[in-house]
Amino acid sequence: MKLIKLIVLSLLLGGCSAGDFSDQNQVQPSSPSKIEDSTHKDSKGIMNFLLIGSDSRGEPQSFSDAIIIAQYVPKEGNIKLISLMRDSYVKIPGHPKGYDKLNMAYFIGGNELLKKTINDNFGIKVDHSVSIDFEGFANFIDLIAPEGITVNVSQKMIDDFNMKVKPGENALKGRELLKYVRFRHDDESDFGRVRRQQEVLVKVKEQLRNKFSHFESLAALPDFVDQGLNHVESDMEKGEILSVLSKLVFYPVKNIDSLRIPVQNSYVNKTYPHSGAVLEINLEENREALKDFLLKPSPVNREYNY
């Protein structure tokens, strides 16, 4: 059985180049300014993934608690993470009010409407989406890191969630790590939560790479994907997921850059009757910041690397 898995995996890796899933330009202008296309699949193989963390506890509809675009360039070993603040006030296609919080798009129309809303407002073409709810997140973390993921826990966080740990560095398992990425009752509020989400995402990437860093361990990759699919929803087929994970192993990640949208000083806090408290963003300024971030060679700013 192991030999069969190795043969299948070798065929998968040999048959999928780094550009197999990038058929279109990845950054599409939403303003009159033209961006020079430097993202052809035969040159860089750029892939854009929409990562969604939903607040679902089993309900048929839920809001997106985390919205992250991960742009991956395997041959260059670069990952760029863009966190879109869920309270950003944007135009949602088909919404009776026109504008609402970004996470309302997911509540109304799931992954597809959220992808369209992001494309219409920010000009980012998403290749694939992956969503995971609270229970799925906890189970997935326990699957890839049975001993937990080490993070720095504050006293405020411990008090807020009644966590059974001491302040400082702790290896948190699934359910406790979920509290870490959801916490927002300090001076940083949602902005701190976004930073922690990006931090944990990078550490998950490291766990995956360590788990499958040897050829022998790759034999377990198909079974791992089967188990992982029990905890996430994705528009990707199993073979596509295997190909992406294999690239993470065979193309070492050299740089991870991160950006938060809206960028600093590009929004104001507003309140609307139909949506409550929102971040009313300067859309043009954020589009330009986003384009600049994606088109610059990595590392864009080492200060933001984890």
Regions found by a protein language model. Give the residues of each.
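Sec-dependent N-terminal signal peptides of Gram-positive bacterial secreted proteins and lipoproteins
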Residues: M1-D20
